[in-house]
């Protein structure tokens, strides 16, 4: 990467305030800026770093008004955070693409391998698998029998995709993720538990990103489905027969129990937990560690365990620290009431 501030502004449909010819070759956080770096300011909490940063240019919102003099070059754009994402996507697309099959990889003879695919060292592609154009399988990836991988999809090292699963186009699956392992299905009997065969699969639609060590279990029958545009963080667990609606995002350690369904455009914070067989509507926001035991209507914002409306949870959180003292006061009041009753009783006699 090496661009002038003016080239970046032109690409982002922005304007330059300062030196349009300053050359930029790397990104840096505004508080850790260095010469030759581009930073961004999208959160007012970080504004004080703008006046001391060593970065040679900073992306700011079009309407940003500095409170002090600024030494660095400003690139004004409609939305600094979105602009940064656009620019980083451009830089990422300029990286050289790996191609070819490593000599230590195994690709079954039945697999039709597009010329521009990459299959890394010790990767294994099973019989009947289908690989789309431009896909990349990094070292030690396992692709099971009958699996389809769409065009431009990237499977990073040690990703495992079990038999019969389907991965869409332009997906990114990070290291250690497991797609299509057996769901947790056991029938109790007199001797313990009998395993229920998990005969379904997992379908991951286009433009999905899945974090490291995330697990998505195959359905008992039919499919566990991750719809288009979903983004899953690391260490997410999605059980059998679940579905996640388009463009929903999960932070780390979200867990969905079996046969639960989440709508479109939802946002779940870290360690959210869903019990089985519930439905969450569209555009639902759940704060970190929220626990759901029942269905949730579209447009809801919940927090706590069990989850409750945000306003109620905030009010309750003010009361929680006072509960021990309140309990003591109630006990004292109960004692006093009991004594008063006894006095009244004696007075009647």
UniProtKB/Swiss-Prot annotation:
Keywords: Acyltransferase, Lipid A biosynthesis, Lipid biosynthesis, Lipid metabolism, Repeat, Transferase. It comes from the Bacteria. Transmembrane segments: none annotated. Its EC number is 2.3.1.191. Pathway: Bacterial outer membrane biogenesis; LPS lipid A biosynthesis. One of its GO terms (molecular function) is N-acyltransferase activity. Catalyzes the N-acylation of UDP-3-O-acylglucosamine using 3-hydroxyacyl-ACP as the acyl donor. Is involved in the biosynthesis of lipid A, a phosphorylated glycolipid that anchors the lipopolysaccharide to the outer membrane of the cell. Belongs to the transferase hexapeptide repeat family. LpxD subfamily. Homotrimer. PANTHER family: UDP-3-O-ACYLGLUCOSAMINE N-ACYLTRANSFERASE, UDP-3-O-ACYLGLUCOSAMINE N-ACYLTRANSFERASE 1, MITOCHONDRIAL-RELATED. This is UDP-3-O-acylglucosamine N-acyltransferase. It comes from Porphyromonas gingivalis (strain ATCC BAA-308 / W83).
